[in-house]
Amino acid sequence: MSYVIDRRLNGKNKSTVNRQRFLRRYREHIKKAVEEAVSRRSITDMEHGEQISIPGRDIDEPVLHHGRGGRQTVVHPGNKEFTAGEHIARPSGGGGGRGGGKASNSGEGMDDFVFQITQEEFLDFMFEDLELPNLVKRHITGTDTFKTVRAGISNDGNPSRINIVRTLRSAHARRIALSGGSRAKLRAALKELERIKREEPDNLGDIQELELEIAKLRARIDRVPFLDTFDLKYNLLVKQPNPTSKAVMFCLMDVSGSMTQATKDIAKRFFILLYLFLKRNYEKIEVVFIRHHTSAREVDEEEFFYSRETGGTIVSSALKMMQEIMAERYPTHEWNIYAAQASDGDNWNDDSPVCRDILLKQIMPFVQYYTYVEITPREHQALWFEYERVREAFEDSFAQQQIVSASDIYPVFRELFQRRLVA
């Protein structure tokens, strides 16, 4: 009898390669479904998996076959309706196609193919080809920094890093391989001994011979050690270079009275999308949350998304606070500084020029990228036009977009953080 020991690392996911090939093949269908899911989901469901539906006609393999078109000369037997030399009209619907999956009194159809993508796959497609623009390495010191990461299993290592599960699995496989033949013979001998005792109880010679053989087989099996040095498996840890780039993202959200609940919800969904993108794509990045109405305040993540505080509108208060925090905690020669601002554009008229001056003189010269999102279905107001002057001065590091409804969130987000081709 042969024994096959499966030592593959991904034994529970034997179709991983096939699944990845399938996802690559139907990438466009999946990306479209992900975009639609992001637009319709609530804030709390933003990072879950998704069911993907692919039309049945799109999963058919190409097949070479005889076409139904062209002119053919065919001789049919005559009948009472047709006589020699008459031409028969071409049958309608001769394309050989299939139905679209709906009810019909003729033809055949195929249901859409539906499958589930995981949370990791959903986020991979959602943030594909996105990055923080102008990210550079700053504050390079003379010493390299490293981080320790898992790199599989090794046969040698420190006893403190022994992998008990893999060790016992290896020992069990070795015992099966070394004693499998003896165990099979032992089972056969025990079965034969039971038969002889039942059918030939007086055949003492054969009984003694079988008992002696059984004792030898058991002794041979017992000599196989439970654990051998060959079985020991250790977690392998290696050092990887740790990039020295440091980045911080400032999130500025308008919570003034002019922001309706629907507008605030759109702003929160935009910032949650941004927060997921940062935490997933960048291992070390700090996020500073600032809420503002007539005054600005730095808050934590919980208060930023769920506080109900409101008031008037002075946008410059948030910009001033951002500038103060930059000067106090984030030296520009060490940090890549980014900012994302969301507002409905409603601001005290005398304050909009102040916002422009703060951006032009105190913020934009020191940041890598600044994005402004205006959430309103109405015409733009003074703040938007002042920010246009900032964009003219900093074309590569300042961007502004308008969001009218929730369906615009994801397209605008991709437009703001689309990976740029470097010439």
From Swiss-Prot:
Record-linked Pfam families: DUF444
Composition skew (Gly residues), residue ranges: 92-102
Renumbered residue ranges of the record's region Disordered: 84-107
Chain segments annotated as coiled-coil in the UniProt record: none
NCBIfam families referenced in this protein's UniProt entry, alphabetically: PRK05325.1-2, PRK05325.1-3
Similarity comment text for this entry: Belongs to the UPF0229 family.
Name recorded for this polypeptide: UPF0229 protein PA0587
